[in-house]
């Protein structure tokens, strides 16, 4: 049988440290002697805070430093900018950033500093000190000479605000990363700044591959300068040449469209008049006028059979003395204007006609005999 023993001081301290507020109040009530209460209260003052059983909430990942923000933090110290507040310099620094040729380097430096900050904190990794160490190593222009190297001119407008413009004859190049072929990574930047005493508390994981890597082939400054100038001069000429070639292609396509429209219109006109179509590429002369018939002037083409048939049909109904001379004098002709329109021609005495194929259609008159024999249409094929 185990014997009861008194708890040690460490066990008592651990027991008290793990009690809740309600349990501590209950313990105070159980102590009756004033001296014991005073001793217990003094003990509570030196007890460490209670440890919660809940897991600690993981710290939210910080947002990586933006490359433009890093560029602005470094070049806002340009000596010529000291006369104006930051709100008047924001637009100028934005213009400098848009034309800066080393954006890839600034992105790599921002990634390296963000990696250091996330591990040891911002207080242990000052941003301005980081740029003062790494920018000269990468041969980036210092703030005092940046405007001059890149051909920027600072002026003051009528309102007293600063403005910048680039001189037309300036010869600026992408300056940075030395004069040799380089391959740069985030780890390379961190290793270099640590070698100069920056961020001693940062521990680099050698087993983790680099997530950001910059490969860049850089020739001599003279070769870069010559290449930049030649590209700058060749760009307007090449753009102008492309513009001329494009306009020439458009003019050629438009000429083909116009020719096809004219040929199609000429073809439609010929088909409408039932002429023999002329060749597509042959120009159709405007030979007719407003005073002369078209058929008489356009080389006298063959008459239209459709119009001739209509003319013959209408002219046959006109009474002519020469055509009716063979009939009796007292005979009533079919095309005689004196005949009433509501009288059957067949029932008229001495009816005669100069139309041999006339068919009696009296059976179709209103009130006609239903039993009358209908005429046979010989020109219709019976099925």
From Swiss-Prot:
DNA-binding region listed in the record: 60-117
Keywords for this protein: DNA-binding, Fertilization, Nucleus, Transcription, Transcription regulation
Gene Ontology CC: nucleus
BP-aspect Gene Ontology terms: positive regulation of mating-type specific transcription, DNA-templated; single fertilization
Protein name, UniProt field: Mating-type protein MAT-1
Keyword Ribonucleoprotein: no
GO MF annotation list: DNA binding, bending
Family: Belongs to the MATALPHA1 family.
Cross-referenced InterPro entries: MATalpha_HMGbox
Subcellular localization(s) per the UniProt record: Nucleus
Role summary: Mating type proteins are sequence specific DNA-binding proteins that act as master switches in fungal differentiation by controlling gene expression in a cell type-specific fashion. Transcriptional activator that induces the transcription of alpha-specific genes.
